Amino acid sequence: MEDLDALLSDLETTTSHMPRSGAPKERPAEPLTPPPSYGHQPQTGSGESSGASGDKDHLYSTVCKPRSPKPAAPAAPPFSSSSGVLGTGLCELDRLLQELNATQFNITDEIMSQFPSSKVASGEQKEDQSEDKKRPSLPSSPSPGLPKASATSATLELDRLMASLSDFRVQNHLPASGPTQPPVVSSTNEGSPSPPEPTGKGSLDTMLGLLQSDLSRRGVPTQAKGLCGSCNKPIAGQVVTALGRAWHPEHFVCGGCSTALGGSSFFEKDGAPFCPECYFERFSPRCGFCNQPIRHKMVTALGTHWHPEHFCCVSCGEPFGDEGFHEREGRPYCRRDFLQLFAPRCQGCQGPILDNYISALSALWHPDCFVCRECFAPFSGGSFFEHEGRPLCENHFHARRGSLCATCGLPVTGRCVSALGRRFHPDHFTCTFCLRPLTKGSFQERAGKPYCQPCFLKLFG
C-alpha cells in the first residue's frame, strides 16, 4: 500500500502541471463490471507491495518515477485552472484503488500458489531489476496530445495490472546471502498448520465421494444393490433381477450365445439363463419325423416325441383322428390303412376282416361270407360240408359227390341202390310203369328208366 500511496501523490503532482487546453474532453463514467469475488485471506510479508508500475504499457505507468529523492516541485499553477480534470481523475482513481485494494490479496495468493517458490523468487528479482532499469527512461508526465482513457478503459487496464501482479511478487526484505526463501502465506487461522496435500488415493476417494453426492442430488441412486451373479461385484445403477439374484445388465446374458437378455424372455437350465433359440436347440426333445427341436405342443407315442403335425399315418399322411392309430414295426398307421395292409383277409371276399370273423377250413371268413358256395345259403345249425376246400350245404355236397337219390333228389345217407349210374333209396328204386319196387334185383332199362320184366314185355314186347 505504500507504493500505491506514492503512486497517488505522483499522480496529483503530475496532473497539476497538465495544461488546460491539452486535456481532452472527459466522457461520462460508464458502469464498471464488478470484479469476481474471492475470499479474503490476510497475508504477511512484503509481497503485498508489488510493483504496480511494472507493466510498461500500463495506463498509469507514466506517473512512476525512480526511487531517488524527488527535487523540489516548481510552483504549481492555481488549482482552479485544472480543477475539472483533476477532480474527475481523482474520483476515477479512488474508485479503481478501492477495487484494487479489495481484490489484489486473494487473486495474488491464489495464482502464486500454482507456481514453485524458487521460480517465483527468481522471477521477482529479475523483474525488479528490469523495472529499475526501465523507470528512469519513462517520461515524467503524459503527452498532452493523448486522450484520457475512460472509466471502462481504466477498468480494463486495472485488470491487466492485476494479471501482472499475479505473475510475480517483489520481496522487500531478503537476506544478504543464502538461498532465496519463498514468501510466507498466512491464513486466517494462523495458529493451525497448513493441511497436507492429499495423496493419490485420497484424491480418488474424494472424487468418488463428490461424484456420488452429485449423482444423489440428481436423483440417481448410488447405493450398491447387491453383488452381480456373474462377476460377483457390487451393482450400482441399473440392475436386472432374475433367478433369485441380481445382475449387471451387461452380464445377464445367454449361457450359449452370450446375447444380452435384459428385456427379453429366457429359459432357465441348471441355474443358468438361455435365450429361446439356444434352449430349444440344446435341451428340447427332437421330433421323431423331422429331427428338429419341439418348441410348443408335443405328442409322445411309440417311445419318442413328435410335432403334432408330424404324427400322422405313414401310408396316407393323414393325421390321426379320434379313432387313434395302429402300430406296425414302430411306425404309426391309421385304422383304414393298417387293416388294408396288415389285417387278415376273408377267404370268401378277400376283404380285410375288421370286426367279427369265422375261422373255418384253415381260413378266416366274414360271418356273411361263410355260406354255401353254390346256393349262398347260410348254414343252418352251424354245420356245413366241405368239398375241395369250399363250404357246401348238404344237398350241394351230395350233388357234387353224386350221392343224391335220383327219384326224390334227397341225399342218400344209409342203404342205397346204385343203378343206371345213379343212386337211389331202396324204396325209391321202382318200375317206371307199375311203380313196384325192384327188390329182386332184376329189371329192364328203357331210355334210362328202370322197368320190371312183365311191364317191359307188355310195353315193349
UniProtKB/Swiss-Prot annotation:
Q: In which tissues is it expressed?
A: Expressed in platelets, smooth muscle and prostate stromal cells (at protein level).
Q: Name one GO cellular component term.
A: nuclear matrix
Q: Name one GO molecular function term.
A: nuclear androgen receptor binding
Q: In the record, which positions carry Phosphothreonine?
A: T33, T188, T407
Describe how expression is induced or repressed. Up-regulated by TNF and hydrogen peroxide.
Q: Where is this motif: LD motif 2?
A: 92-104
Report the locations given in the UniProt record.
Answer: Cell junction, Focal adhesion; Nucleus matrix; Cytoplasm, Cytoskeleton
Identify residues that carry Phosphoserine: S68, S137, S140, S141, S143, S164, S186, S192, S194, S403
Q: List the residue ranges of the region (Interaction with PTK2B/PYK2).
A: 1-240
Point out residues bearing the modification Phosphotyrosine.
Answer: Y38, Y60
Q: Which residues carry this modification: N-acetylmethionine?
A: M1
- LD motif 1 (motif): residue ranges: 3-15
Q: Which InterPro entries match?
A: Paxillin_TGFB1I1_LIM_dom1, Tgfb1i1/Leupaxin/TGFB1I1, Znf_LIM
Report the residue ranges where the short sequence motif LD motif 3 is annotated in this entry.
157-168
Using the UniProt annotation, give all residue ranges assigned to the region (Transcription activation): 1-200
- Identify the residues that the record assigns to the LIM zinc-binding domain, covering every copy: 226-285, 286-343, 344-403, 404-461
Per UniProt, the ranges with Basic and acidic residues bias are: 124-135
Please state which protein family the record places this protein in: Belongs to the paxillin family.
Q: Know anything about its domains from the record?
A: The LIM zinc-binding domains mediate glucocorticoid receptor coactivation and interaction with AR, CRIP2, ILK, LIMS1, NR3C1, PPARG, TCF3, TCF7L2, SLC6A3 and SMAD3. The LIM zinc-binding 2 and LIM zinc-binding 3 domains mediate targeting to focal adhesions and actin stress fibers. The LIM zinc-binding 3 and LIM zinc-binding 4 domains mediate interaction with TRAF4 and MAPK15. The LIM zinc-binding 4 domain mediates interaction with HSPB1, homooligomerization and targeting to the nuclear matrix. The LIM zinc-binding 3 domain mediates interaction with PTPN12.
Q: Which PANTHER family match?
A: PAXILLIN-RELATED, TRANSFORMING GROWTH FACTOR BETA-1-INDUCED TRANSCRIPT 1 PROTEIN
Q: How does it assemble?
A: Homooligomer. Interacts with PPARG. Interacts with TRAF4. Interacts with CRIP2. Interacts with HSPB1. Interacts with ILK. Interacts with LIMS1 and LIMS2. Interacts with NCK2. Interacts with NUDT16L1. Interacts with PAK. Interacts with PTPN12. Interacts with TCF3. Interacts with TCF7L2. Interacts with VCL. Interacts (via LD motif 3) with GIT1. Also interacts with GIT2. Forms a complex with ARHGEF7. Interacts with AR/androgen receptor in a ligand-dependent manner. Interacts with CSK. Interacts with PTK2/FAK1 and PTK2B/PYK2. Interacts with SLC6A3 and SLC6A4. Interacts with NR3C1.
Q: What is this protein called?
A: Transforming growth factor beta-1-induced transcript 1 protein
